[in-house]
Amino acid sequence: MADRPVVAVTGPDGRYPIAWGATRLAVFLAGGTAVRLTPSNFREHQKERFQAIIIGGGSDIDAELYGGENTEHSRIDLERDLFETEMIGHALDTNLPILGICRGAQLINVVLGGSLFSDIRLLREQTSNRRTPFPRKTAIAESNGVLLDAIDSDQWRINSLHYQAIDRLGEGLKVVARDLDSLVQGVESISHRWLVGVQWHPEYLIYLKRQRRIFRHLVCRAREGAAESLKLPED
């Protein structure tokens, strides 16, 4: 469809991960068209224009980027860190709608001057550290905002596939949701047109209406601001 906003979805190099397929479907169901961007292929898309961007999940963020220390469990993809940092900067400069998923939310926080917990497993007291794509954990609303407008509930079920989490909040962000251990589960910008970061993976939960609504809100904002599209920088 000609009126489908084009949404850039960042991810790692290599084979197509399951997360990309799930995110692509979520964007399609929301009325948009997803285009996969990686550190090695983004030059192929430099002539395209995007109306929104999703910073996807995946490997851990290099702790050196926020003054922390990596652990023995850290899986670092520095090339991706640097590529997505640049993409976030351009999206912020052009006021493009941004959704950060899991590591994407964490990286947005780091780009804005915040820090992360490198390993949250010792911080959990109320919930387990079991990683699962199924909605086995609970997020609780902390403040109103665009995420709560999308979720339309003060409590909802989430999945958990992470060891890192937001610690010190980045400039211009506010916390809008936490889990039962008070770890940050949702952030958004207090000034950007539409910037939301979620610590869970809504792309794996699109069989739940509340999770689909996150992508629908992103695509709606992209369509409203289609004139403010992002063209990737030339070399």
Predicted regions and their residues:
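N-terminal beta1-alpha1 cap of cysteine-dependent amidohydrolase-like domains
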Residues: M1-I101, N109-V111, F117, R121-I151, ...
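Active-site-proximal beta-strand elements of phosphoester/diester hydrolases
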Residues: L195-Q199
